[in-house]
Amino acid sequence: MVHRDKILCFLVLFCCFFAHTPLQAQQPRKKVGLVLGGGGAKGAAEVGVLKVLEEADIPVDYIAGTSIGAIVGGLYAIGYDAADIDSLYRNQNWLFLLSDQVKRESETFLSKEEREKYIVHIPLSKERKVSLPTGYVKGQNIFNLFSKLTVGYHQVDDFSNLPIPFRCVAVDLVEGKEVVFSSGSLPMAMRASMSIPGVFAPVEWKGKMLVDGGALNNLPVDVAKEMGADVIICVDLSTGWKKKEELKSASSVVEQLISMMGQNKYRKNMAEADLYINPSLKGYSAASFQSEAIDTMIQRGEQAARQKWDELMALRKYIYADACDSVVSDDTLQDKRLKLPKPSQTEAYHIGSIRIEGISGEEEKWIRKKIALRENSEVSPEEIDGTLAMLRGLNIFSRVEYRQSNEEPYDLVFMLEPNESRRISVGARFDTQDLASVIAQISNNQQFSTRHHYAFTGRISRNPYLEMKYAYGNLFGAKIGISYRMAHYDFDLYADKHKLDALEFLSHSFAGFYTRDIGNFRLKSGVQFDYYHYHSDMFERDGSIQTRSSDHFLNYFASVVMDTYDRCYFPTRGSRIQVQGILHTDDGIHYADGNPFGEAVFQGECAVRLNSRFYLLPKLKSRFLFGSSVPAIYQNYAGGVADGYYLPWQVAWESAQHVHLLERNVVTGQLGFRYRVKGKFYLTALGEYGKEARKFSHILIGDDLWGGALRASYDFVLGPVSIQANYSSLGKNVGFYINAGFLF
């Protein structure tokens, strides 16, 4: 009886307990894993899917991503919502980010000159071996953007402790194995996961060479399951196998190769997804970063998710099937995301110490003087960006990146990697005047650690030259130097609308100089010995012939150049001004036993923005010769599209292809109107007017020069491509000209 009473009492207590504690309260909801696949620019569709998931109030407990999916997923994991990522996606200059370009206003004078001549720079290692790059793009711009977007997450012990636990996938080229990032630098993990082989340089990490995770696991469903996900929502950006006619670009070929490599795992992971979303992205590729394409792909991602709305609602019901009402009400996705911390892109924050890694103590002292940031101070994200741009613009580092500690005040570390001691630079161009031209240079002009700087430059063309230059001093300060240049000139000379002859001569120039670059200014002065050996007759402006077979001169020169253009070709703002004076002698004091003769040069031009497509491009140039006796070689020559191509003092006259002999005093003006038709395609109309006179005092009443040209151009990565038609009073005939490549 006592035993029966004890059992009865126990049953009563048991029932009372569960009467006040529902069984479902003991069961949490199911955990949701979001898997974001790779696909380059097509990742915009993932942003559209995120918008619908937020609208449907689908909770996200784990995120696993590959390539662009790692970027979208990584940002979502630290607090950015779909609207934030949408804005980031639309407002980026993707052409700049997916390159190693440096904004021209951040570059030094020397860097501007070299970048606007050469197509490729190949480092030479200390062992004098050619060191080819491991990828077309090092990815510094995109990495520094990731670092900016992930402040506070540069050194993470465990990605499981992020606001939303996160993993991303890369592939180790050394062992051919998949690497899943679960800790460390979040921006570095994102950058490694998107290192498309051959396009982006691999990321070196713990002895591994990491490339795009899509090569082995482009849809990491298995990774999300290992994290603990019960339910998998998968966004797949693939568009199936491309047909032969669709493989027309490098990006489409690389995309197809990556898809082929991970097919077995891809199919298995796709089959294990509880909800599979595959936006319709036919016609778009990993390189479709145009604003119109991004807008369309975001919409298509949203449409694809909305088409699954009923399945989303059923899935949400399944996720909460075993959970009580309080769990459901406390788990609203929108409320949870509002509570997530998110790095600010505009607010200033405090930094603590500043360290610089990768350079010597002497170099560090100089760099600290250059940067405007100070320890234990407040800085803005824009100031960090400006410092990075300045360091990259110096052109002496192959790597400029940074990291910060995770808590404010953030300790700031700049990670620098000096360039190789030497490099080979190569450029090429084609035009209808000289056909093909090639230029090559071997230099150490990108080495800050030495005070000895040299450059050997050669051009192969109808007018070839060889130049050797040595300078001693601070690379970005004052330098003294010497140079030698041997050049062969061969071009047709015209005067008064008629061809005089084909000029041909050889020149040797030896110079000693002082130069200093100060911001956008370059100061230069020196003395130069010129020797000319003529293989043809030299003509005076009146048609008379100079009978000498050679000439020699000892000249003194000084010049100031200011350049604030944002771009050398197709500038949208800024200006360029040059002022130069030269005194010519043949013995250091006299010329032809009389007084020396001199020249004064002024050139000024600018770009004026009228609206987003129209630009006004005025130019003014003049060259005045003073003295009773001026030899034929130093007279005024005009013609062609570039100053100094046929002779160092030849002035461009873009409405005439041939070189024309002018009077001793010349003033020319040009007014151009440039219209950007679409993207990188431009149309330009320009008019030219000038005056020439024997005497300086007669310049205003001198002979008229006029002309005009219409030009269609495309801003190609290997140099501008253009075709133009022109007419000038110098030739009185319609001319046509085609150019492809940088001018040099």
Q: What function would you assign to each model-found segment?
A:
Residues P381-T387, G393-Y565, Y569, A638-A652, ...:
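Gram-negative/organellar outer-membrane beta-barrel architecture
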Residues R485-Y489, D530-Y532, V579-G588, R623-L625, ...:
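Short glycine-rich beta-strand segments
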